[in-house]
A protein has these predicted regions:
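Boundary at the C-terminal end of the N-terminal hydrophobic targeting segment
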Residues: 24-28
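A short beta-strand micro-motif common to beta-rich folds, especially ectodomain repeats
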Residues: 101-112
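Bacterial N-terminal signal peptides that target proteins for export
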Residues: 1-13
Length: 283
C-alpha cells in the first residue's frame, strides 16, 4: 500500500520532535511573573521591589523595561554552598526612575537562562510610596498616612480589609485612584482576579463615598472634604476574597484629575479650544 507523501513527512517531523524532547528540556520552564511588591515606584527615586513568579528566577541577569527613563537591575543572589541551582520564586529588583520620566504603567520582563519571563507591570507615580504595614484591618488599627501619597499593599487573604487614616481640611479636594485589577490582565497564570472596592468614611464611621467599578474593575473617588478632621480609606475585595498576588496602588492627592478632553478629534490646519473634563479642575 502506498503512503501519502504529506502524511509521511508529518509523521517523520513528529517523530523527530518527540526524539528531541528530553526530561531536561521539559523542566526548563520560563518564569511566569505573578506580582511586584510594592507595585509602584516614585519619580526621581531608586527603590527595591520584590517580584514573585511561578517557576525558577535563579540566574536572571537583565530587566527589560518599556519606555524610557525607567531602568531596573537584578539584585545579586548569593550562590549556594553546595553549588546546586536553587529554585527561586522571588527576587529583588532595583528600579531607578528619572525625575522627568513619564508617569503611568510600564511593562517589564526578566531575561533568564530559561528564557524571557512573562510580562510584569509597575506604576510610575509622582508622590511618595507608602507601604501597607502591620495590622490595619479595622478602623481602630488603621494605618496613619499623610497625603499626597501612593499607597501600596495587597489584598492577600480572605476577608482582608486594609484601612488607612489621614487628616484633611474643609474644602480640600481629594482623589483616590486604584490600580489593581487592570494590572492583572498581563499576568499569565493568575486564575482568579481581584475585584476591589474603595470606601471613604468620616472618623465617626459615616460613609462619604464608595467606588467599585470605575476604570474597568478598579475604583476611583473624587470628593471635597466636608469638614476639618480625620478620615478613613478602606480597600477590600468586594467578595471578601484574597490572594497574595493581588497587589494594589492607590494614588491619593488633591491635584486636578483630567480624564479626557473635548473635542476628541481635531482637523489638521485648524485652531481648536480644548476643554478638559475631569475632577477638581476649578472654574
Amino acid at each position: 500500500m502506498l503512503c501519502h507523501p504529506a502524511r509521511s513527512r508529518l509523521a517523520l517531523a513528529t517523530a523527530l520532535l518527540l526524539a528531541m524532547a528530553s526530561p531536561a528540556a521539559t523542566r526548563a520552564e520560563y518564569p511566569m511573573l505573578m506580582s511586584l511588591q510594592p507595585v509602584a515606584a516614585q519619580l526621581g527615586q531608586t527603590s527595591e521591589n520584590t517580584v514573585s513568579s511561578r517557576y525558577n528566577l535563579y540566574g536572571a541577569y537583565q530587566v527589560l523595561v518599556s519606555g524610557s527613563k525607567v531602568t531596573a537591575t537584578v539584585v545579586a543572589v548569593p550562590k549556594t554552598k553546595d553549588g546546586k541551582t536553587p529554585s527561586l520564586t522571588s527576587l529583588k529588583l532595583k528600579f531607578t526612575v528619572a525625575a522627568d520620566a513619564l508617569p503611568g504603567v510600564r511593562d517589564f520582563r526578566l531575561a533568564t537562562p530559561r528564557g524571557a519571563s512573562t510580562i510584569g507591570q509597575i506604576v510610575i507615580v509622582a508622590d511618595p510610596i507608602v507601604n501597607e504595614t502591620g495590622n490595619n484591618n479595622s478602623t481602630s488599627t488603621a494605618q496613619n498616612i499623610t497625603l499626597p501619597a501612593t499607597i501600596c499593599g495587597a489584598i492577600e487573604k480572605a476577608e482582608d480589609v486594609d484601612v488607612f487614616k489621614f487628616t484633611a481640611t474643609k474644602g480640600q479636594p481629594l482623589s483616590f485612584h486604584v490600580r489593581s485589577q487592570r494590572l492583572q490582565d498581563r499576568i499569565h497564570d493568575l486564575q482568579k482576579h481581584v475585584d476591589p472596592i474603595l470606601t471613604l468614611r468620616t472618623a465617626a464611621g459615616t460613609t462619604l463615598a464608595a467606588s467599585d467599578n470605575y476604570f474597568f474593575a478598579d475604583p476611583f473617588l473624587a470628593i471635597t472634604a466636608p469638614a476639618d478632621g480625620q478620615y478613613t480609606l478602606e480597600i477590600r475585595d468586594v467578595r471578601y476574597q484574597g490572594n497574595s498576588f493581588w497587589q494594589y496602588s492607590i494614588q491619593s492627592h488633591n491635584r486636578p484629575v483630567i480624564e479626557t478632553v473635548h473635542p476628541l478629534a481635531v482637523a489638521t490646519g485648524t485652531d481648536v479650544l480644548l476643554a478638559p473634563i475631569g475632577h477638581h479642575l476649578g472654574s
